[in-house]
Amino acid sequence: MKIGNYEIYSIKSGMFRLDGGAMFGIVPKVLWNKLNPSDELNRINLSTRSLLLISDKRKILVDTGLGNKFDEKFKSIYAVENISIEDALKQKGFVSDEITDVLITHLHFDHTGGSTKFENGQIVPTFRNAKYYIQKSHFDWALNPSDKDKASFIKDDFLPIKEFNQIEFTDGNFKLDNEIEIILSSGHTPSQQHLKITDGKNTIFYCGDLIPTSAHIPYPYVMSYDLYPLITIEEKKKILPQAFEENWILFFEHDPFTSSVTIAEGKKGFEIKEKDIIPD
C-alpha cells in the first residue's frame, strides 16, 4: 500500500499472551471470550506488529516488539513465540541498518523490547543508524513508574539508546514531515505517541495501546493496564468518530486476527467495515 511518498508495510514479529481479564477490564469474560478465546491460564493471544514506512529518503519503523533479550521464565509466563524485529524486517526485504527513524509509542516491554539487543556481551541499540523518537515526559515516567505499571518497563530496553546518544526526545504533538503527524494520548500511559499518516485521500492511524485490538473498538472495552481508563474512553471518543468520518485505516499492534480495519456505524456503536487493508 502507498500513501503519499511512503510505501507501507506491516511487520509482524510474533505472538504472546496476556491475561484476558486484564486486557478487557470490566467487560465480562462471557463477552470477550467470544472475541479472543482464552487458554487454561485465562491468557489470550496477542500479536506484536510494527509499521514500516518507506520513502526515497527515510525508512521509519513504529515500535519494535518484544525483542529477544528475555529468559526462559519470561518466555513461559507470556507464552512468547516470536522472531527478532531484525528477522521480521528481513522477511520483507529490509535490514536494520537501513532504518533511519524509530518511533516508540511508549516504553512498555512489548512495544520497545526489540529496540535493543545483545551484541558481544553488551546491550546495544538494534538500529544503529536511526534516531529513536521518545516523548521526554514518558521517558521520565519510565524511569520512575508507579507501583501499578513498573513491571511493564525494562530499563535494558531503552537506557542503552540514551547511552549511545540515539534518542530524539519529543515534547507533545509534532510532525515528522508534511504527511506524518504524531498525536499523543495519556489514558494508557503518560504521553503515548500515535503515528498518523495521510495524503489527503488515505489515512492510517497507529492505535498502539489506545485501541490494542479490533475487539477494543467499543468505548467501554478498556484495559485494566490503563493508568487512567476514563481518559482512555474520552480519547477513543475523540479518535473513533474522526476515523469513521474520514475513513481512516486503524492499524492494530496486538490484534492476533487482523492487522487493520476501517469502521462503520452500527446499532451499538462503531463496528468493523473492512479488514486487513495492510496485510501482514
Regions found by a protein language model. Name each.
Residues 2-7, 12-92, 194-209:
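Conserved beta-strand hairpin/beta-sheet module of binuclear metal-dependent hydrolase folds
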